């Protein structure tokens, strides 16, 4: 008979009330000392594990918890430290310097964790790295929980194939050699766990879902080298986010268990299971509860799915678990959450997903009748949610059906539009601008809280927003920026703001998830059809424009980013949701243009993150993503300039799609890529308007004029001068005013110097 256990891959770090964020930021500001900070982090770690124990999870992970990022943890443990930080002597200072930068050294690059909204710190390889195990965090965490709670846990570490695949600074042909150099470190780390009596370790290898058959075979050799040195420690090879194509090779790995995602695999893992079976002597860790979305599971449907898996895989032991780490969903339903009852009851966060696993285990062990009450409650909650969502339906479907090809394209080509826009806008060569947001001071946050608590009237709050907007319009004019922004002081988050103002969205107060470092976001919940209600940005943008003779950009978040940064409904396709959002935003774009705004920016920073992991699935997504953007923007006059912005992406993968957006100007986060995108542009020119970020806004460091001038000069070597823009990487909301003004002053001066040089060349 098959033994059934519940397992988890990872749990949110941030705490129910973002205590983790607050502890980090207090330490960075110097308002708490290191001992206090480490104690706070330890308490949060213990609390996260205790929650999983209390939910009766049989196999609880450790070392998924981190002070910043689990990939950075792995790098630092292996002494994988960039040269510019090796002079630092304190381990904690070094760790945070890599993530955040210091005065004389820029931070390491940050990019998306596969196709999620989580960002990891990219390890930087160079041949001078002296690999050694400097810390066994897995052992420390295992001991800490054993001491505190007396329970066995499952240490987690990023595997050698995935870790090196996610790194940069080496040629592709060098990857295998670097992976092999890491093998002795993995062996040392795992043997120390084995000597401690650890029973299971989880080695995460999500990169195997995108690996070629050759690479899966190569990774198998790594595991053969590692596990041949072990005797009693069981290794779980964990994959997630999709299926593994080289399945037959995967199930032959010399490990004691294999984790597969049966939620986001498009049914492929189950088909592989049916075709090739599964080793009966290995544990099958089946991801059957969605680790990335927030909707309550249909327990009967999920139970039947697990029984289907069991009927095929005659394994001695089955672990049921989330499809991925629960890092990507909120911690738990907050007792003070304000959502409508039928909506709230239809949601399931990390803690609730663990309860679903426990119920499924009971159904598997004792039979479906044993959880009949839970099954019926889940069905009732799902049906109530469906009825609630139906009540919010709109006329969108009819409008979408009436769209024609002309609704998805501008009337004339870019080159013709450019001439008209140059004449209409009257901008200088190498125009300077910012991406949208300016620092949200304590005063801004306090004003928003007073308004939300009804301590301030709408009029009081609007007067404050207007005053802050005017102050920053004046600052921008003093800095001599060419195209201004209103600063977005009325917005807490670029997606949240629109989620609150469009029909079909619900907005939470406490459903926070980690985006990067201490930054947490509350993704809107798309539960029904999305519909435009009334203008959302026109009033604030028009007010800002009234204060200056320079152009002020209208600022919107694009349909694909709103989709990808929300928790979308799961009863219709993502394409249909994106088109609904695009149609709603199209009306906002038209309202801005009708109000006299001549430059409108529609940000799509998350376009790439929505890519399916397998390249064979890309075309379908990229086609409808570009169509959704053009649906948003194509109704404007030829003289109206459409901008878009992207960040944290491997742009090389989507350059054709960027072109298909048909935006007049795209601004791109660039400084943390350390010139990588410029190298690409040398051989793949981009001929529309382009602004490559000249400084990193994620760091408090103020770059010099010379540094930014050099970046501009390097860019102009491969980019057309007459359509190049100068801008920071991203929005400046999280920065302080002093450093923002100083950096922008240097940026404008760098642009002036580059402009003068180009004028002399002409």
UniProtKB/Swiss-Prot annotation:
Give the organism's phylogenetic lineage.
Bacteria, Bacillati, Bacillota, Bacilli, Bacillales
Which E.C. number(s) belong to this protein?
A: 2.1.1.14
Name the catalytic site residues.
698 (proton donor)
The protein here is known as: 5-methyltetrahydropteroyltriglutamate--homocysteine methyltransferase
- Provide the positions where the record notes the PTM S-bacillithiol cysteine disulfide: 719
What does the UniProt function comment say about this protein? Catalyzes the transfer of a methyl group from 5-methyltetrahydrofolate to homocysteine resulting in methionine formation.
Cofactor or coenzyme needed: Zn(2+)
Q: Which Pfam families does the protein's record reference? A: Meth_synt_1 (PF08267), Meth_synt_2 (PF01717)
- Where along this sequence does the record place binding of L-methionine? 435-437, 488, 603
Q: Where does 5-methyltetrahydropteroyltri-L-glutamate bind?
A: 18-21, 112, 519-520, 565, 609
Question: What gene name does this entry carry?
Answer: metE
> How cofactor binds (record note)?
Binds 1 zinc ion per subunit.
Family per similarity comment: Belongs to the vitamin-B12 independent methionine synthase family.
Q: Supply the source organism for this entry.
A: Bacillus subtilis (strain 168)
Q: What processes does the entry annotate via GO biological process terms?
A: methionine biosynthetic process; methylation
Q: Which GO terms describe its molecular function?
A: 5-methyltetrahydropteroyltriglutamate-homocysteine S-methyltransferase activity; zinc ion binding
For this protein, what post-translational modification is recorded in UniProt? In response to oxidative stress, Cys-719 can react with bacillithiol (BSH) to form mixed disulfides. S-bacillithiolation leads to loss of catalytic activity and methionine auxotrophy.
- Its annotated pathway? Amino-acid biosynthesis; L-methionine biosynthesis via de novo pathway; L-methionine from L-homocysteine (MetE route): step 1/1
